[in-house]
Amino acid sequence: MRNRFGCLFSLTTWGESHGPSIGLVIDGCPAGLPLSLEDFVPVMLRRSPGRLGTSQRKEADIVHILSGVYQGKTTGTPIALQIFNTDIDSETYRKQDDRYRPGHGQFAYEKKYGIVDPLGGGRSSARETACRVAAGVVAAKLLAHYDIYCLAFLSKLGKESIKEYPQFTHEFAQSVYSSPFLSPLASDTITKQLMDLQKEKDSLGGVVSFITSPIHESLGEPIFYKVQAVLASALMSIPAAKGFEIGLGFASADKYGSEYIDPFIFEEGKISMSSNNCGGSLGGITMGMPLNGRVAFKPTSSIKQPRLTVMKTGEPTVYSTPKEGRHDPCVAIRAVGVVEAMVNLVLADLLLQQRCSRL
């Protein structure tokens, strides 16, 4: 089983949903980067459960630095971080351990490995993404040193979506971070949809978009490691992710070449483009434009309606999520921080690779 992501700036995560703790090791972070416990607090809060539209499992998600930092700066050695699980309720899973949970990876996991930890989803639980968000904090600090910034936000919930694609500004980022749903969509509209979901005992899918500041570093390679290829791999590894696109994405298929091509222009002493249909990547390499893309998330499989399934012995039966079960009615809300983290991790890794690509 592979638990490592990245090449030069790499992340390894460990732990299960209902284990004592989860954690991660970052390898390849340069020495001298300022890093403190306070850096993690606001970012971890944006992913944390316990609010409307998210799981009612209340985890503090306090990050503990075990190694790799001395006197407030990274030392260049592996950075080990640990997050304790403090709000675990395994009994609801043990009660129905004799049957498979519809829509979850438990059956496939057990078929592949012959053994599975079913409590809270075990290793395949979205709980693991807290580690990615913590790692994203370190990656974001490295990128900020090179004036590269990324923002993710909820751009579509069910049939409600943003009308225009925004540009990255720090002011827009602050407005997203101050929203309870990390979205430019109207909070009262989202609240109504989520309240309706609770009444209907159902769940809803969504889309998380990301935008970056202009990236003047040449990140990515022209063949197998195009920036969009690495982003796709990273973002599609997030639990419940079902689709990825960059720039116009699938809408590109509806365009004529004369409509799609981004014209080059010379502006303020440098070559740029007058549009960004490509999403910030030409030939798989960034070239001064902002990156932008979207990730589609399926509706959460854990809904409080009875669903058809089978016993582990093969007999037909029903799986019912207990009333006390704690699950996200819309996983896309908490996925916002995970998308932002994974984009930051990809860009940090490609940035270090770019430093090695030429004299």
UniProtKB/Swiss-Prot annotation:
Transmembrane segments: none
Enzyme class: lyase
Record's keyword terms, sorted: Amino-acid biosynthesis, Aromatic amino acid biosynthesis, FAD, Flavoprotein, FMN, Lyase, NADP
GO molecular function terms listed in the Swiss-Prot or TrEMBL record: chorismate synthase activity; FMN binding
CDD domains cross-referenced by the UniProt entry: Chorismate_synthase
Domain of life (superkingdom): Bacteria
PROSITE patterns: CHORISMATE_SYNTHASE_1 (PS00787), CHORISMATE_SYNTHASE_2 (PS00788), CHORISMATE_SYNTHASE_3 (PS00789)
Enzyme nomenclature, EC number: 4.2.3.5
Biological process (GO), any one: amino acid biosynthetic process
Gene3D superfamilies noted in UniProt: Chorismate synthase AroC
Cofactor(s) named in the record: FMNH2
GO cellular component entries: cytosol
Catalyzed chemical reaction(s): 5-O-(1-carboxyvinyl)-3-phosphoshikimate = chorismate + phosphate
Keyword Repeat included in the entry's annotation: no
Residue numbers binding NADP(+): 47
PANTHER family in the cross-refs: CHORISMATE SYNTHASE
Subunit structure, as described in the record: Homotetramer.
HAMAP family: Chorismate_synth
Family: Belongs to the chorismate synthase family.
Name this polypeptide is given: Chorismate synthase
Organism: Chlamydia felis (strain Fe/C-56) (Chlamydophila felis)
Lineage: Bacteria, Pseudomonadati, Chlamydiota, Chlamydiia, Chlamydiales
